[in-house]
């Protein structure tokens, strides 16, 4: 818990003079028939963390994009990854890249 308390406040305690680029990714949620101790949801707790950005993707493509964005963010980011999402297959295309091989080769 100290990580969450300290990291969220450090950037603002220093007057924004230094970045705190931390990404914490954790499984979240129920719906996969987990037992009592494996079906916790942290959304309400996480929403009260000062200084943290909280994201939760709804599909595999969103998870990919949110992770890339979280890594580049100078603030601490908590990625709550729904457990049911871990069982989905994502698209084979990378967001922002053309599907046509000829167009991709012209870009390179």
Predicted ranges, named:
Residues 1-108:
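Conserved thiamine diphosphate
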């Amino acid at each position: 818990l100290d990580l969450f308390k300290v990291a969220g406040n450090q950037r603002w305690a220093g007057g924004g003079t230094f970045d705190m680029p931390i990404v914490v990714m954790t499984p979240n949620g129920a719906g996969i028939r987990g037992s009592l101790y494996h079906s916790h949801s942290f959304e309400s707790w996480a929403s009260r963390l000062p200084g943290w950005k909280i994201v939760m993707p709804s599909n595999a493509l969103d998870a990919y994009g949110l992770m890339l964005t979280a890594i580049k963010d100078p603030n601490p980011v908590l990625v709550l990854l729904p457990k049911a999402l871990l069982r989905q297959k994502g698209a084979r295309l990378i967001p922002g890249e053309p599907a046509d091989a000829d167009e991709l080769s012209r870009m390179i």
